[in-house]
Amino acid sequence: MWIADQWKDYEVIDCSKGEKLERWGQYTLVRPDPQVIWDTPKTERGWKHMNGHYHRSKKGGGEWEFFSLPEQWQIHYKELTFNLKPFSFKHTGLFPEQATNWDWFSEKIRNAGRPIKVLNLFCLHRWCYSRSR
């Protein structure tokens, strides 16, 4: 199993009661996650001082509530830069667990000895791109 453990700008800080508290660069977000089935106390400071909270609707979907969060911002993973933006369906336009795949194809590109183009199907929005710093 490959583990995405090289992040400096992303981390799951805590999770409880169907939600996870994440740090995306300098901002913290709370988003629902159906895999979080435990009900532990939400003692981390970030639960009270988040920058964005996605509230799931009982009818499906949901909406964001923002606290001092810009419309979009950037985070970095090694030599890659990503633009983030909260979407109406809880996502930010980036799947951090894909970092192991980025590491793998970054090595392949470096060793190809020729220019390479990559289509990132995990980031389909025109503003969500990665580039060398």
Where are these regions (language model features)?
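Non-catalytic substrate-recognition/targeting regions of SAM-dependent transferases
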Residues: 5-24, 29-96, 103
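Conserved SAM/SAH cofactor-binding pocket of Class I
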Residues: 106-133
